[in-house]
Amino acid sequence: MLNLTSETISELCDVYGNAFYLLDSKKFNNNFVELSNEFKKIYPNFNIAYSYKTNYTPKLCKIVNDNGGYAEVVSEMELEIALRIGVEATKIIWNGPIKNQDKIKQLLLMGGTVNIDSVFEMVNNESKKITENENV
């Protein structure tokens, strides 16, 4: 855990300005592992899908991926971040109300998951066209 003093914060402000993120990646990692392990005691098939919308800082997203977590994305940018840091498509879940039809098709063909908000959503029509993947 970080030991912050007012002097340390002042030094950081001198370097980065008054607005910056300070992340404790070790603490984030430990919290992720602890949460996952506790749930797996009760639900052995439990997985965490980390919301990139909440904080898509690649370092944090990579920690989630390195610990077996899933990427929950809501935009093309978040999808690209997930793929760029090495998340397997099978561990990407596209959620949210706005979905690019071409990106959905790409993710489905790669083995990813798309949450469907209604039976009328465009994903339903697209998935019917994809015959190579029986899990759609």
Labelled PLM ranges:
Residues 1-113, 119-135:
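A charged N-terminal "starter" segment
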